[in-house]
């Protein structure tokens, strides 16, 4: 009742209670205006404009634990993502955590979709693995943090070792990502297809490709839900007022992960919407910050 009322703009007063204003999640225009400082280093892992990754590196000698940041935006460039995650990257770097802020080709860019989007994310993470020593990064302490569409990609990236050998996305030595924080994620391309279509106007076929004789199951190498178990711990954080990826989607995915034998938990944040999950000035940030520090075995602040 409370969530529905807030979404409709009502204030509900029950007997014996005091009227309070409903939470107001950050609006899209305000989210798109969010910017963080410039990264310490920028790498181009391909020739396309979106094939870049940014490094926010802490001061000091290192080696530093790493948070791989994969922004969302309905797999479409008009919704931004990279600039907004710069603020989180800079905040993490100030705490001694390196942030690897990944950009990738999206559905409305040449080469985006299946398989290009996945290849971009995988390549960006492979760059981290191959350059970690020179950049003073500790790949034994890694967490992937993805928001919305980026959560789908982060969970997929952590499961790359489970890719069918015949898949064009398969790699010989994928970086182990022991923990993934999914923020308002849409991780199950098969069962979340309707939610993805309603929220993003995207047909999941653009994200999975079409089946053929050599690849009859298009989810086997694109959807993390079909790549379980994968020895990854999942923490699914969702705003109570998230209308794009409602908390029940996270709960269903967590149940599926647990049923497969991997650890997972769901966290619902009161008074937070979908875009609040990706900004510092929100009820989500303190929980996200504490979660990142927890999985990287850093002391609580």
Residue ranges and their predicted role:
Residues 27-32, 38, 48, 191-226:
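Mobile cap/lid helix-loop segments that gate and shape the active-site cleft of serine hydrolases
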Residues 126-194:
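Primarily recognizes the serine-hydrolase "nucleophile elbow" in alpha/beta-hydrolase
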Residues 23-61:
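N-terminal cap/lid segment of alpha/beta-hydrolase-fold proteins
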Residues 236-238, 242:
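Short beta-strand/loop motif that positions the catalytic acidic residue
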Residues 272-282:
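Catalytic histidine-centered segment of alpha/beta-hydrolase-like enzymes
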Residues 112-133:
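Alpha/beta-hydrolase active-site loop
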Residues 243-252:
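Conserved alpha/beta-hydrolase "acid-adjacent" motif
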Residues 81-100:
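Short amphipathic alpha-helix adjacent to the substrate-entry channel of hydrolases
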């Amino acid at each position: 009742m409370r969530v529905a009322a807030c979404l409709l703009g009502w204030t509900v007063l029950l007997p014996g209670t005091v009227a309070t204003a409903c939470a107001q999640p950050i609006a899209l225009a305000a989210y798109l205006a969010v910017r963080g400082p410039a990264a310490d280093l920028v790498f181009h892992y391909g020739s396309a404009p979106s094939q870049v990754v940014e490094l926010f590196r802490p001061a000091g000698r290192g080696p530093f634990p790493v948070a791989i940041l994969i922004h969302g935006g309905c797999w479409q460039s008009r919704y931004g993502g990279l600039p907004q995650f710069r603020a989180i990257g800079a905040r993490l770097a100030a705490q001694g955590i390196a942030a690897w802020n990944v950009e990738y080709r999206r559905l409305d860019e040449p080469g985006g979709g299946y398989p290009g989007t996945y290849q971009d994310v995988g390549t960006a993470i492979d760059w981290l693995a191959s350059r970690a020593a020179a950049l003073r990064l500790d790949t034994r302490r890694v967490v992937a943090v993805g928001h919305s569409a980026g959560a789908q990609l982060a969970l997929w990236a952590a499961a790359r070792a489970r890719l069918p050998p015949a898949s064009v996305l398969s790699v010989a030595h994928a970086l182990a990502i022991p923990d993934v924080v999914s923020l308002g994620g849409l991780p199950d391309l098969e069962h979340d297809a309707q939610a993805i279509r309603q929220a993003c106007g995207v047909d999941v076929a653009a994200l999975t490709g079409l089946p053929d004789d050599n690849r009859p199951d298009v989810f086997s190498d694109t959807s993390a839900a079909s790549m379980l178990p994968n020895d990854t711990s999942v923490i699914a954080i969702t705003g109570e007022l998230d209308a794009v990826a409602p908390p029940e989607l996270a709960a269903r995915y967590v149940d599926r992960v647990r049923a497969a034998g991997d650890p997972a938990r769901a966290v619902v944040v009161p008074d937070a919407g979908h875009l609040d999950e990706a900004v510092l000035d929100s009820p989500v940030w303190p929980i996200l910050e504490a979660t990142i520090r927890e999985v990287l075995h850093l002391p609580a602040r």
